[in-house]
Amino acid sequence: MDIKLKDFEGPLDLLLHLVSKYQMDIYDVPITEVIEQYLAYVSTLQAMRLEVTGEYMVMASQLMLIKSRKLLPKVAEVTDLGDDLEQDLLSQIEEYRKFKLLGEHLEAKHQERAQYYSKAPTELIYEDAELVHDKTTIDLFLAFSNILAKKKEEFAQNHTTILRDEYKIEDMMIIVKESLIGRDQLRLQDLFKEAQNVQEIITLFLATLELIKTQELILVQEESFGDIYLMEKKEESQVPQS
């Protein structure tokens, strides 16, 4: 199963998405939390053996530098340098946000003008799997990044050696669907509770993506940073009440 990530136009686009989840002024956002989420996202792509372009890795290096500076003892010169790097990054994100808003405005105008002209039908091309720039799908990926990081830590603390099995996406799709039998929804993190190793977790996640792609499952998230639920596709789906 090929997965092609077309979610973000670059590292600043990813950072802007992470920052916007806080629903506050960019300069008030807890930058350390944003850095952790960015690094977890990139780490997850690498764990899934997906291509991570150089610009994302360069940004990851810059973020790790900012993070390390913030962890150092409060020495005046170091603190000033760390603050400069942080402010520089936030300024870049704010500038990118303005350009993106302008681009969206121009695109809307372009689409409006396009209504006055006839054009040939667009040929639809279907790929094996494509994660479109959909907020909930991106949040699914970010939530999975956190789950994977926690499970890796759990496996490391247990010090247990488990023989590696060959996991198939088709088999895991059945497991995911069976997990929903007799219930209206399933919290994403609960899906991975019994997983025994990283490969099993990743294959389960790929199976979940495939079920979403084939519209057998839908995602529900009530609010930013809230739990993500998996639900079977029905005509009317209710958001789980907490």
Swiss-Prot record:
Q: Does the keyword Flavoprotein apply?
A: no
- Name the predominant localization: cytoplasm
Species source reads: Streptococcus pneumoniae serotype 19F (strain G54)
- Which segment of the chain is annotated as a signal peptide? none
GO cellular component, alphabetical, reads:
cytoplasm
User: Which HAMAP family does UniProt cross-reference here?
Assistant: ScpA
- What is the name of the protein in this document? Segregation and condensation protein A
> What protein family does this chain belong to?
Belongs to the ScpA family.
